[in-house]
């Protein structure tokens, strides 16, 4: 699957509802998750209800990024689908690619990824917070 979003992708067949989560998407942003499946399977929607995914490419709109991440986790664990992508869609129709940002999931090691907040010692070498309190030193 490519990084750009194809809005003509088929959506899963719903056997429930989204709980009214997408009503505000006309004035606010919404999120889309896309994935490819080898066969049709029934899955649980994070907003409640179930849907039947199509064989091939699928596109599902959700109101929150967390809902897309929850569905992605379900696709990864239950159906062994690793090629899902998450996009933010603005009211003007512009789509922004969100996840996985550099092509590798955050829990995997990527040689090009720079660590954030990495400290080059183990936890036993940390300073005692009581000794540096009110000294304007940082303990991390």
Swiss-Prot record:
Top-rank taxon, per record: Eukaryota
Sections of the chain in a coiled coil: none
Principal place of residence: plastid
Membrane topology: Peripheral membrane protein
Disulfide bridges in this chain: none
SUPFAM superfamilies on file: Photosystem I subunit PsaD
Keyword Plastid: yes
Compartments, record wording: Plastid, Chloroplast thylakoid membrane
Cited InterPro entries: PsaD, PsaD_sf
GO biological process, one term: photosynthesis
UniProt keywords, alphabetically: Chloroplast, Membrane, Photosynthesis, Photosystem I, Plastid, Thylakoid
Gene3D superfamilies, per the entry: Photosystem I PsaD, reaction center subunit II
Gene Ontology CC terms, in alphabetical order: chloroplast thylakoid membrane; photosystem I reaction center
Function, in words: PsaD can form complexes with ferredoxin and ferredoxin-oxidoreductase in photosystem I (PS I) reaction center.
Family classification: Belongs to the PsaD family.
Designated name of the protein: Photosystem I reaction center subunit II
Gene responsible for this protein: psaD
């Amino acid at each position: 699957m490519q990084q750009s979003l194809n809005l003509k992708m088929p959506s899963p067949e719903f056997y429930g509802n989204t709980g009214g989560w997408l009503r505000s998407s006309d004035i606010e942003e919404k999120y889309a998750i896309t994935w490819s499946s080898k066969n049709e399977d029934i899955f649980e929607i994070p907003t409640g209800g179930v849907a039947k995914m199509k064989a091939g490419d699928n596109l599902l709109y959700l109101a929150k990024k967390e809902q897309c991440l929850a569905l992605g986790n379900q696709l990864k664990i239950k159906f062994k689908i690793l090629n899902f992508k998450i996009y933010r869609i603005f009211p003007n129709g512009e789509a922004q690619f969100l996840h996985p940002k550099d092509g590798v999931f955050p829990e995997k090691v990527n040689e090009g990824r720079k660590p954030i907040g990495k400290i080059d010692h183990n936890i036993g070498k940390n300073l005692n917070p009581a000794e540096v309190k009110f000294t304007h030193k940082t303990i991390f």
